[in-house]
Swiss-Prot record:
Function of the molecule: One of two assembly initiator proteins, it binds directly to the 5'-end of the 23S rRNA, where it nucleates assembly of the 50S subunit. One of the proteins that surrounds the polypeptide exit tunnel on the outside of the subunit.
Lineage: Bacteria, Pseudomonadati, Pseudomonadota, Gammaproteobacteria, Pasteurellales
Organism of origin: Actinobacillus succinogenes (strain ATCC 55618 / DSM 22257 / CCUG 43843 / 130Z)
Protein family (similarity comment): Belongs to the universal ribosomal protein uL24 family.
Stored Pfam families: KOW (PF00467), ribosomal_L24 (PF17136)
Record's protein name: Large ribosomal subunit protein uL24
């Protein structure tokens, strides 16, 4: 099955503490989760690893959120949008459902 949300898509968060935030998808995980730039920042406690020269301490990083909690952002309408698929010239393409424009 083709993915409706892919890496480098601009998305908007629909639910959770970061609702309304926009960001670029940096990674799509196989378990149905996505990592979005600047969204769901968590603080991890890292142990020092002297062999690799890593210092320990608190590290801020993005945590994965469920793909159902994000929607692709349509720059023409400035709103969240749904994604559809269709064939054009023998190729499967994604399009915005609100204005039928190819992504």
């Amino acid at each position: 099955m083709a993915a409706k949300i892919r890496q480098n898509d601009e998305v908007i968060v629909l639910a959770g503490k970061d609702k309304g935030k926009r960001g670029k998808v940096t990674q799509v995980l196989p378990n149905g989760k996505v990592i979005v730039e600047g969204v769901k920042i968590i603080t991890k406690h890292e142990k020092p690893v002297p062999a690799l020269g890593k210092e320990g301490g608190l590290v801020k990083k993005e945590a994965p959120i469920d793909a159902s909690n994000v929607a692709i952002f349509n720059p023409k309408t400035n709103k969240a949008d749904r994604v559809g698929f269709r064939f054009e010239d023998g190729k499967k393409v994604r399009f915005f459902k609100s204005n039928n424009e190819i992504i």
